[in-house]
Regions:
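Alpha-helical transmembrane segments of multi-pass membrane transport proteins
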Residues: 1-279
């Protein structure tokens, strides 16, 4: 769902030949589909897991929580409003969002009380971005090697001579991307894999928008895929549960998401309809 970071990296970094705005529009309906399916499953299974620790829903508490988070809830409004409003480029929208966040944190919430606090936050962000840029740089170098070695052309020639059905190609693509999502860091996967699958998809008549959303949906699926899905490891650490238990209880949710990814894959208008009617 917008504003999704990985779509920004894929399109803003030139990995996919579509704009950030188009990726946001293409990802809206698939994102709502996955959210709706997982929410339905959680609501359906909640009562079956027992009532221990469950609290009744109180509208007054919900309103109070929403009011307390009002400034934070406006962050995506600032980002998307400035971008889709037409008065900011993606880079300018990012800068405007960062400035708005800084004002909220330092002036309204007063979490940053001095220049020392601000420098600490900037240093932490710099370390994070440095790691991401290092991964992207190495992955981009590997991608250039693949292009120079004509690996995408060889892959297209092999696929078109071996696979004669678009639907079979999509099934194989999902299986490959599921493995990649469970084993490869997503930033590197975007830079290395997307330039390979886009020519393959175009050879089978698939649009880059559709392929980009299929890729991102499978990466999210890979986060839940045992045995090394990142979200499984984080959940095991956060809730202090053994990895085997976290994996076991996540399998039904994984199955629900697999159905959602297959719908996104085989019903292309979920990704292409909104960009076509929203210029």
């Amino acid at each position: 769902l917008p504003p999704m970071l990985y779509a920004i990296i894929a399109s803003g970094g030139g990995v996919v030949s579509v704009s950030i705005e188009e990726m946001f529009k293409a990802g809206l309906l698939p994102g709502l589909l996955l959210v709706g399916m997982t929410a339905w499953w959680g609501i359906r299974q909640g009562p079956k897991l027992g009532e221990a620790g469950r609290q009744p829903f109180v509208w007054a508490e919900a309103k109070a929580a929403l009011w307390g988070a009002k400034w934070e809830l406006l962050v995506p409004v600032v980002a998307l409003g400035s971008l889709f409003g037409g008065f900011a480029t993606p880079v300018e929208a990012a800068a405007l969002t960062a400035a708005y966040t800084l004002v909220v944190v330092s002036v309204l919430h007063r979490d940053l009380r001095s220049l020392r606090d601000l420098w600490r936050v900037i240093s932490e962000c710099g370390l994070l971005m440095g790691g991401v840029l290092l991964i992207l740089g190495v992955a981009l170098g590997f991608t250039h090697y693949l292009v120079d070695a004509e690996i995408p052309d060889l892959a297209v020639a092999w696929a078109t001579s071996t696979i004669h059905s678009k639907w079979l190609f999509l099934l194989g693509l999902n299986l490959v991307l599921l493995v990649v999502g469970g084993l490869v860091e997503i930033y590197a996967a975007i830079v290395v894999m997307v330039p390979l699958i886009v020519p393959l998809g175009e050879a089978f008549g698939l649009s880059p928008l559709h392929l980009g959303i299929i890729f991102l949906a499978n990466m999210e699926l890979g986060f839940l895929a045992p045995p090394v899905g990142l979200n499984l490891l984080l959940a095991s650490y956060r809730f202090k549960k053994p990895m085997s238990e976290v994996t076991r209880v996540s399998l039904p949710m994984l199955a629900v998401m697999v159905i959602g990814v297959l719908l996104i894959t085989y019903v292309p208008w979920l990704t292409t309809w909104l960009p076509s009617v929203w210029p």
